[in-house]
């Protein structure tokens, strides 16, 4: 095991991150810089967890993934988040549809909330209970279409 190898440092950072040690994870990722896209991705996940959304967006730039869309949403770019998740392979998953519903909620788009929740729930019925109490959808809790989707 070569502790000076940047990929090893990246993997050590991932281990620290899984253990919840964000400080050492960040240090390991920083020393692994230049080792490839995996390092930037791991740094971005840490950035999201630490609330550094603009840095996460930068580290995920061009990834067209769930996490890039999430980082954009959390940084306030609702349209960018929707474009990113819609263009990604993740957009066709249950969680991708759920994220689209959250983005729609933040945009005030009732039709988007309902249609995306229905799609998400059709792919993973377990999302019904999550959606029924998710504060992102509080504006729609009394809406008959929302209630029908999550029952």
Enumerate the language-model features and the residues they cover.
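Canonical tetratricopeptide repeat
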Residues: 11, 42, 67, 99, ...
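Start-of-helix register in tetratricopeptide repeats
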Residues: 7, 38-41, 63, 70, ...
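Register position in tetratricopeptide repeats
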Residues: 18, 49-50, 74, 106, ...
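Short coil turns that delineate tetratricopeptide repeat
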Residues: 3, 34-37, 61, 90-93, ...
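Terminal, low-structured helical/coil segments at or just beyond the last alpha-helical repeat
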Residues: 122-151
């Amino acid at each position: 095991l070569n502790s000076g190898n940047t990929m090893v440092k990246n993997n050590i950072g991932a281990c620290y991150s899984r253990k919840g040690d964000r400080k050492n994870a960040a240090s390991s990722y920083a020393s692994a810089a230049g080792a490839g896209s995996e390092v930037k991705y791991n740094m971005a996940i840490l950035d999201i967890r630490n609330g550094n959304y603009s840095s996460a967006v930068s580290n995920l730039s061009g990834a067209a993934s769930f996490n890039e869309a999430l980082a954009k949403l959390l940084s306030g770019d609702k349209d960018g988040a929707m474009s990113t998740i819609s263009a990604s392979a993740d957009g066709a998953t249950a969680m991708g549809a759920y994220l689209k519903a959250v983005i729609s909620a933040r945009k005030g788009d009732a039709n988007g909330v309902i249609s995306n929740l229905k799609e998400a729930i059709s792919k993973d019925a377990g999302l019904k209970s999550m959606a029924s109490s998710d504060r992102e959808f509080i504006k729609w809790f009394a809406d008959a279409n929302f209630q029908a989707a999550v029952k």
